[in-house]
Amino acid sequence: MYRIMIILVAGHTGAQTGAIGVNKSNYGRIDEGYETIWLRNRVAQILNEKYGCYVLLDDNKDKLAVVIQKIKSVVNKDDVCIELHFNSAKNSTACGTEVILSENPTDEEVKIGVQLLNTTAKALGTNVRSIKTERQTPHNQLAILHLPCSSIILEVCFCSNLHDSEIYFHNREKLAAALAKQIALIANKL
């Protein structure tokens, strides 16, 4: 029997390589390049230790093209790739959790996207914004969404929003546990 592989990718890996959040939070500011690594590693640790899931992590030093090449070389259609991000907007009132899927997502990707969206929003207490397709983003096409497996981008919250930033820092351990549990359920149901 094939064991589902979960691939967790930290978007914008490395300090100050992604969005940088507001500086008025009691916890400091979200540095997307750091927080995606922290969240990825914590979720993977829980998946391994508590649920016995097979988890593959991206290498923090690789460029996205290399990450995608490596993933393509080891996955099959039953596997699941989740890339973690923190959203940012010029409008500091933008808030909530989003999921991004390819233009033509599979039913399984939509199902997983809804589950991750709701799990994240519930764990953090953020608004459920939406599930978007890649063309509804400023980037138009996102390579990570074109793998030979189910692929989802999770925008955890808006680091440009003070409330989102504070509830993320206050609840990030709770979020990691909730995501790990949901991902373990996904892996066992596929």
Predicted regions and their residues:
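Solvent-exposed loop/turn segments at secondary-structure junctions
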Residues: 13-15, 60-64, 86-91, 104-107, ...
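Sec/Tat-exported extracytoplasmic proteins
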Residues: 43, 47, 51, 75, ...
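Active-site histidine-acidic residue metal-binding/catalytic motifs
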Residues: 1-69, 95
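Loop/turn elements at helix/coil->beta-strand transitions in domains of secreted/extracellular proteins
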Residues: 2-4, 48-54, 76-81, 123-127, ...
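A short, glycine/acidic-enriched catalytic loop
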Residues: 15-31, 88-119, 123
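Second-shell loop/turn segments in exported
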Residues: 26-34, 56-61, 100-106, 162-170
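Active-site-adjacent mobile loop/cap segments within catalytic or ligand-binding domains
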Residues: 7-9, 18-21, 74, 81-87, ...
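Extracytoplasmic/secreted envelope proteins and their assembly/folding machinery
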Residues: 40, 44, 68, 97, ...
